[in-house]
Amino acid sequence: VLATSTNEINDQLSAVVENLGFQVIRGSENDVLQRYVDAAAATNADVVIRITGDCPFVDPQLIDEMLGDFISSNIDYMSNTDPPTFPDGFDIEIFKMSALLQSAEIATSPFEREHVTPCLRTNSLFSHKNKAAVVDVSHLRLTVDEQRDLDVVRGIANLFAPRTDFSLSEILGVITTNPHLITGNLGIERNEGATMNSGQKLWKRAQQVIPGGNMLLSKRPDQFLPEHWPAYFSKALGCTVWDLDDNALTDMSIMGIGTNSLGYGHPEVDAAVAKTVRDGNMSTLNCPEEVYLAERLVAMHPWAEMARFARTGGEANAIAIRIARAATGKSKVAICGYHGWHDWYLAANLGTENTLAGHLLPGLEPNGVPENLRGSVLTFNYNRIDELEALISTHELGAIMMEVSRNFGPEDDLLQKVRNLATKHGIVLMFDECTSGFRQTFGGLHKMFGVEPDMAMFGKALGNGYAITAVLGKRSVMEAAQNTFISSTFWTERIGPTAALATLDVMEQTKSWEIITKMGSYITEQWQSIAKSNGIAIKTSGLPALTSFSVDSKFALEYKTLVTQEMLKKSYLAGTSVYVATVHTKEIVDRFFAELEPVFALIKECEDGRDVKSLLDGPTCSSSFKRLN
């Protein structure tokens, strides 16, 4: 009997098995225990022999031996995996129907329901027995969970073809004379699927079909907690995220990478979007909301007169660069900050792969970026006006693009000095506010410093989770967009600007920037407080609403990993940065710090000599962006 799920992905498998003349029973994807109960009941089974689909080589002779032993021993449950001595992939479980039914009544946790037999194996109500191999060969991996496993199994099967009745002893003989056959899947942990969360399982699948595994470097699990990060979400509301195993996790981390300053699923924003979905998101005609949004943003920034929209921050910055170059007729650009992934930006690394080390990540290779862009993008460090002056004195610059504030704010009137230089030399000054916008002011952070750019780019928080970015600028610059080609179909969809208009309404009504700035300052103070009480040296940085800390230690990354690991066990998504949302109430934050304090005590123990790596359940997280806000 094949007991598989009702998921349509198994339709083809079910059809093949039925055509071969075998019975197929289908049931729940996640409640596999109930699926087994249904399959056993449908066939009037007294005894169930469980062979999972990842064990293609399982030996019929071994099954017969174990079944005879099971019947003569009159026990409830028998396996050959507790402890394992046979190769991974030769797993056999045998149990009474009565025991299966009883375990189905007892087992309540999602883990027990998914993995069928944990209750049978661990509950004292059931009698057990284990079948041991004459020689322990449990180090061999002959199961099929990953592509590497399939390659190994195929290599062995091909040696026996066309036979399909080869035994375990024959396989061991082939491996002895051809040890290279089993090198392809070395290093994969036995039964890792039994302890791996659903997110990690999907992440392993993702890496087979998506280069890098996902679309955003900042969301890769190795940036947080390698091998254990939940990786994917099923739903999100407020500051709670549910993973694929339906665990509710409080997000005290980066809130969608800064996209949701009003919290996930804000009712007013979502209601506006839902109406747009009902009324229609696209048509041959333009959506009026793009006009309303342009007028709204221009009114908020009196120096600006025109706007263009896109759907990602990288696009917005690329649009701005194109317009600035068209307006000035000059191709060279000076940058200070992180401005996306496009060719124009990564061209900075054509001279050396470390040019962007202090702006984004060290070691970025500009593969695929045309060599003829070399020298078109020049960098200067934040708060180093002398470096910008040197660039201007030796290059014909068309534009300066920079973040208004980085991990630390401007010193010695930096922004005004940059403005003065740009004006003096006829250079277009652009402020990248994709991350900093709407965090500390209603609009661009530059408003707080009283310095007006020629162009500014906004994103992330503008749509509270919906894709919308904006390029604002003076008419004298923006009209150059008509002298080049900047156009894209999905920049005309309606959901983005609708969400932005609703988001701006809520922000203005609640003064959201004041709320998140105040709470961000409080979070920073709490980090400093528990660090001081535990005798730990930390450094804090970033805008209050984009606050972060790092332990001043050579083990800073290990400590970041430890924080994430221990707080995940307490149902928090956490690390060393918090992108604050209005839904982060004092009650939520105080509860978080009450749980975090013991982790800081652990860090102190490690600073005093305890091995931090001995506390980690997996590898250390990767280093992330140099720029956090």
Predicted regions and their residues:
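PLP-dependent enzyme catalytic core of the Aspartate aminotransferase-like
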Residues: 508-510, 518, 569-629
